[in-house]
């Protein structure tokens, strides 16, 4: 059952998988192709396959078969990385900062020690 992505979050492992898919030039990959990118010790093929099933059920990826390889499923993201960032940041702003952009920015300004050049760049972006 596919659910609304705006109400879904990705686990750390799911996020790692999605980042690998988003980085693909072909915008899709099989479990075997994804597995080849992992450093040793690699997760089990079945473990990665289970995560792909979960991501499919959550509505983040779609399994497809290519014409040139009718046996293997290739998984294509159904949401862009930027779209997911927007969803997550909106949720963080609303749930942790009471919907206040000012509180969110204030938190990062105080906690992250933003370099002066980045502050100037941020101010320029705000003025646009």
Pin down the residues of each PLM region:
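Short, cationic-aromatic polyanion-contact patches
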Residues: 10-13, 66-87
